[in-house]
């Protein structure tokens, strides 16, 4: 029976399934071919032909088994290849180890042969050494005596050099203490100098005159210190002489004369000290009474203000004199209230008149004078009719505005002075106090003086040059900020002083002239070091003898080669002969020789 023909959809489904199975099988065979090609085998080909004479057909199960078998065979071959590779590597490693063992064995045999030869040569040399040992012992005793003598001389030299070193260390310590003392004196001098200047001038020195005054103070302070030291020295001398005179009073007929001369010298020194002290006090008073530049400027401004106030007071007196006559007339009025009111009105009127006179003064500002000019023409008429003081209010308001703008002017002048004269420290203005014209005039005067000084002194560098110098100093001495310039300058100054002191001390120690250069100093120090090295080499040559260093090195190498074998041989001899001392080997061998005979 034939199966019933399926519908078109039923016929398409098995065909699609067959196609997918076929594609899957082909993909599996392709993977098998890839494995075969990786192992160097030829791939299998899937042939699509209708002629089946030259072909062998497998079913699906057999083809699947074939694929599995091929996979297993390929994996087994790869595993076997890995095992073979590992076996080859282990075999090579074992061969290398065997070669190393063979080389070690040959080295050991060679070493054993060398040791046997050494033993034979040592046995042959023992006889010679027995004969030479006695002679060498005598020679060594003589050498030991010579070396002991050389050792004594070297010890004496060593002690001498130690004494020299201790003396040099003491001198170095004394020089260090002297340097510390001088540094402390220098610091005390600077401190006292600044303290006296601050006491005299109440400020910090920053001008050329201040430096000159500091030099003058330093000069007088050094003079006073010198006189004090001389006085102390003379007092010590007088005390020592008095002691000596007390001891030898009977034998010294001129004791009273010496005492009188010393007393006279003391009086003279005391009078000199008193004169210098009085001169110092006079200078201090003179410096205290002298005004500073700032005070002079303030005095000038105060004089100008007083002149202005004097002129104003004269004008007020002229205005008040006619008013007094009016007051005398008003005294006759019967009403007391009216009299008081009149006095108050008079005072107000005087104040307004004074304000008006100030405003209409030709010395007033130009803007204010122009605005008040219309009221000034009819001033007398206004005084008679309605007093005409209505124009004062806007003028005073404008004046107040101008005064408030003084703060901005002060700030701008301050910035300008900081740019032009940054070394002048301006006082900080208190907020409670108003801005005064004197302060503005002071700032302007300082700037004008600096400009005039710059014009007079053409050699004085400008601000850019000074800034370039400061930046160059910062680059040279690694100063990051301006605040570190002065400490680094002090450090450089102290280092330079230390170097100059060291150079001066070396010149004195080496007995060189103070005008000699550093090259001469370095060359003399090099010569001195060379002489010391030559002296040390000569001493080493005296200790080692006439032989050179190369022969000594050869002897030491021969000793290092010979001594281990000889030590082993002597240890064996000591064990065989049952002896603990090397000196007993020769007598023991002689005894054995006698016993053998």
Curated annotation (Swiss-Prot):
Location of the protein in the cell: Cytoplasm, Cytoskeleton, Microtubule organizing center, Centrosome
Q: Where is this region: Disordered?
A: 1-24
Coiled-coil annotated residue ranges, if any: 66-179, 254-320
List UniProt keywords, sorted A-Z.
Coiled coil, Cytoplasm, Cytoskeleton, TPR repeat
One of the GO biological process terms: regulation of microtubule cytoskeleton organization
The TPR repeats extend over 483-516
What GO cellular component entries does it have?
centrosome; cytoplasm
Instruction: Give GO MF terms, alphabetically.
Output: gamma-tubulin binding
Q: InterPro entries from the xrefs? A: CEP70, TPR_rpt
Which PANTHER family does the UniProt record give? CENTROSOMAL PROTEIN OF 70 KDA
- Report the protein's function: Plays a role in the organization of both preexisting and nascent microtubules in interphase cells. During mitosis, required for the organization and orientation of the mitotic spindle.
Any notes on this protein's domains? The coiled-coil domains may be important for tubulin-gamma-binding and hence for centrosomal localization.
**Subunit note:** Directly interacts with tubulin-gamma; this interaction determines centrosomal localization.
Q: What is this protein called?
A: Centrosomal protein of 70 kDa
Origin organism is Macaca fascicularis
Q: What is the lineage of its organism?
A: Eukaryota, Metazoa, Chordata, Craniata, Vertebrata
């Amino acid at each position: 029976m034939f199966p019933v023909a399926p519908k078109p959809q039923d016929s398409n489904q098995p065909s699609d399934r067959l196609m997918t199975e076929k594609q899957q099988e082909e993909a599996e065979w392709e993977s098998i071919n890839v494995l075969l090609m990786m192992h160097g085998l030829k791939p299998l080909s899937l042939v699509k032909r209708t002629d089946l004479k030259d072909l062998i057909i497998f079913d699906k199960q057999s083809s699947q088994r074939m694929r599995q078998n091929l996979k297993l065979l390929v994996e087994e071959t790869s595993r076997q290849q890995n095992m073979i590779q590992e076996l080859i590597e282990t075999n090579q490693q074992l061969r290398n180890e065997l070669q190393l063992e063979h080389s070690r064995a040959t080295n050991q045999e060679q070493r054993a042969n060398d040791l046997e030869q050494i033993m034979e040569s040592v046995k042959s040399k023992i006889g010679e050494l027995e004969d030479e040992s006695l002679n060498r012992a005598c020679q060594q005793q003589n050498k030991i005596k010579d070396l002991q003598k050389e050792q004594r001389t070297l010890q004496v030299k060593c002690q001498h050099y130690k004494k020299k070193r201790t003396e040099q260390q003491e001198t170095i310590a004394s020089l260090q203490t002297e340097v510390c003392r001088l540094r402390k004196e220098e610091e005390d001098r600077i401190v006292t100098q600044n303290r006296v200047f601050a006491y005299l001038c109440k400020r910090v020195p920053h001008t050329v005159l201040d430096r000159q005054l500091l030099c003058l103070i330093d000069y007088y302070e050094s003079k006073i210190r010198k006189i004090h030291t001389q006085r102390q020295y003379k007092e010590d001398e007088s005390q020592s002489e008095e002691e000596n005179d007390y001891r030898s009073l009977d034998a010294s007929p001129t004791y009273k004369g010496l005492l009188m001369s010393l007393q006279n010298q003391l009086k003279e020194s005391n009078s000199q000290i008193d004169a210098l002290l009085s001169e110092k006090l006079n200078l201090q008073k003179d410096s205290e009474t002298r005004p500073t530049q700032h005070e002079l400027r303030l005095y000038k401004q105060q004089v100008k203000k007083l002149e202005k106030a004097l002129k104003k007071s004269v004008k007020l007196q002229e205005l008040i004199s006619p008013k007094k006559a009016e007051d005398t007339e008003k005294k006759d009025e019967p009403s007391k209230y009216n009299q008081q009111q009149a006095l108050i009105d008079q005072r107000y009127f005087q104040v307004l008149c004074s304000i008006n006179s100030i405003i209409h003064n030709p010395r007033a500002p130009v803007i204010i004078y122009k605005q008040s000019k219309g009221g000034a023409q009819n001033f007398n008429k206004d005084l008679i009719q309605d007093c005409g003081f209505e124009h004062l209010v806007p003028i005073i308001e404008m004046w107040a505005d101008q005064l408030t703008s003084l703060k901005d002017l002060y700030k701008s002048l301050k910035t300008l002075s900081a740019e032009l004269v940054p070394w002048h420290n301006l006082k900080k203005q208190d907020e409670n106090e108003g801005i005064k014209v004197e302060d503005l005039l002071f700032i302007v005067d300082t700037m004008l003086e600096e400009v005039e000084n710059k014009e007079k002194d053409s050699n004085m560098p400008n601000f850019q040059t000074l800034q370039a110098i400061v930046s160059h100093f910062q680059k040279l001495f690694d100063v990051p900020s301006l605040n570190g310039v002065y400490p680094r300058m002090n450090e450089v100054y102290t280092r330079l002083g230390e170097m100059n002191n060291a150079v001066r001390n070396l010149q004195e120690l080496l007995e060189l002239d103070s005008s000699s250069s550093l090259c001469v100093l370095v060359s003399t120090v090099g010569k001195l070091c060379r002489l010391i090295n030559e002296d040390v080499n000569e001493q080493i040559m005296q200790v080692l003898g006439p032989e050179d260093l190369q022969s000594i090195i050869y002897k030491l190498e021969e000793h290092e080669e010979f001594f281990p074998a000889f030590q082993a041989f002597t240890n064996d001899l000591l064990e065989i002969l049952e002896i603990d001392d090397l000196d007993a080997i020769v007598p023991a061998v002689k005894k054995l020789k006698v016993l053998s005979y």
